[in-house]
């Protein structure tokens, strides 16, 4: 029996290694996919985690309480379905991005050890894993929305995720088109299914999109801000290889660019929160975001590209806190 176990151990080890590499490929070993669920379960998309969470929880807060038939259990169930769908789709998008970028990643110090760039995962394995995650995401959305308008919610992010890695190519810079545009859209979009998860029987798809516009715009510019700061870590290698990125717009004036990106965020947050008439949200969301983003912009040092990495962590914590704030708002509305 011992000899049989020994004979099987290399294959078992190889299988475990592949499973781990697939999880790494989808960034499931990191917090990155959680950005996609912030806006929607407020559906992201999170950038994404916060986007989804923000949209779904606050939509639910407008319906609970005052004798309403809408229960906390149902709102939390819809939010969980939204978050799971976003998380799974984000993982699929990461696989596609790394497959397209595998040759570029192999020549960048920070990314050369990624599963596809290093050859630990084959193209066939990666594509099967990607399709599986997309199928799971579609099924979860179908279940959450009772089969209504599922393709309307999926198609925009499918197209965006497909185009995103191509936006990094040098030819796109000639048209002033940068991958951060697509990333911002795909992370912001989950706000729509997040709201629809709650209102799908009460408003049309177009009405849900319109209601989410302030949140969509806020998350769009917030995502470009945090991704520009984070990607700036690779500025030296990216410029050597001619990688197209948003921080090349103003060259050495990246700090000014980041400040400008926060202007629409500062405008859209009040526009979105105004509909809820909640002092708690003004303090816990608008107030905390103002202090955090001001702190981030003062800490960023364009002469030290590594400083962008810490901003990524700060924004994840900011999104996570806002999910907590939205949950508290929901509970206060329900028990008031």
Curated annotation (Swiss-Prot):
Pfam families: UbiA
Database matches in InterPro entries: Prenyltransferase, UbiA_prenyltransferase, UbiA_prenylTrfase_CS, UbiA_sf
Biotechnological relevance of this protein: Diterpenoid pyrones display various biological activities and subglutinol A shows insecticidal and anti-HIV activities.
EC number: 2.5.1.-
Keyword Transferase attached: yes
Pathway info: Secondary metabolite biosynthesis; terpenoid biosynthesis
Chain segments annotated as transmembrane: 34-54, 80-100, 125-145, 181-201, 205-225, 253-273, 274-294, 311-331
Molecular function as annotated in GO: transferase activity, transferring alkyl or aryl (other than methyl) groups
Annotated keywords: Glycoprotein, Membrane, Transferase, Transmembrane, Transmembrane helix
GO biological process: terpenoid biosynthetic process
Enzyme class, UniProt record, top EC level: transferase
Cellular component, GO annotation: plasma membrane
Subcellular location, record wording: Membrane
Record keyword Metal-binding present: no
Top-level division of the source organism's lineage: Eukaryota
Residues glycosylated per entry: 66
The protein's role, per its UniProt record: Polyprenyl transferase; part of the gene cluster that mediates the biosynthesis of the diterpenoid pyrones subglutinols A and B. The first step of the pathway is the synthesis of the alpha-pyrone moiety by the polyketide synthase dpasA via condensation of one acetyl-CoA starter unit with 3 malonyl-CoA units and 2 methylations. The alpha-pyrone is then combined with geranylgeranyl pyrophosphate (GGPP) formed by the GGPP synthase dpasD through the action of the prenyltransferase dpasC to yield a linear alpha-pyrone diterpenoid.
PANTHER family the UniProt entry points to: 4-HYDROXYBENZOATE POLYPRENYLTRANSFERASE, MITOCHONDRIAL, PRENYLTRANSFERASES
Protein's recorded name: Polyprenyl transferase dpasC
